[in-house]
Amino acid sequence: NLSSEKADRASIFTGLSYVFLIAGTATGVIAICQWLTLDAYIPGMVDMQRAVRPYANFAQPNNMATFLLMSLLACLYLYEKKKVQTKWLIPAVFMMLMSLALSQSRTSWVACICIIVYLAYQQFKGYISIKWYYVTAWTVLFVGFIFLLPTIGSFLTQFADTQIKSVDIARRATGDMSRLAIWQQMLHAIADRPWFGYGWNQTSVAYTLVSDHFQGPVWVRSAHNFILDFILWNGLLIGLPFLAYFGYWGYQLNKHVNSVESVIGILMIGAVLIHSMLEFPQYYAYFLLPVGFIVGLVQSQQSNIKTITLSPNYMRAAYAVSLVLLILIVRDYSVMVPKLN
């Protein structure tokens, strides 16, 4: 019901983009404060303690980076639709790009390349109107942040009464290739049980069993690749047909792109999808729920699909249940945090 008409889809996507803009800006501010070691003095921010790369309140730099990419795409949508004045978008995008560079997330680097290529393609088709030199300027700024911020951090450490941590960009780009070893080990695990797999969410079991004859670099509970995880869980007989269907579904979504909403939606989905090929963002509700919502918005643009109209009472009931679940989550979290500390 929310996206059955074009005007409704635009309105809903605009509201979603406002949420990403606000959350992304707040995330950027928190990450910069963490980098400057101010997080210990400001309430509501996670204290980095021994961590080196800022992660805002996500507790994982790569997750923060992917969320910032989605927020930047939301800013692009608001710019395209002229919903927010450019003078307000520029400082927000500046902080997000700075925080994205501070995360030193190689996953985000790969995603950025894919986003720029797809944007250029859709700009050629006429769905995106932003000038190429604007995209180039922001890209150059982002690359400049990647190389300059570690140096700026070292300078501030020497001449100010603070201890700013950073990782050399060359070492970050070429170090820690453990994912390749993990993938190799998981391929051996698939070869041991190729047809029916190990069961849902049993990657750690697969790791334990395969370690008897093929050692891996670290203990894992995920293959750091959605395709490998899905085949490990279900085996080739069930996994391959489902993966083929997912691929066909994605092809159909991209084939029917016909508006700015669908272009930005595809890019947001793609950012999380690329991340899922290198880690496991699908394990987190703050990615899974928005992606599912965006997929629904993009899917609704196909005019030849069958739709079901539900009574507003279903939505009211869903909101009520969601509110109860949110209260329970907050309660459990408030009980668990003191125990973890």
Where would I find each of the regions flagged by the language model?
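A juxtamembrane structural motif centered on a specific transmembrane helix
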Residues: 294-341
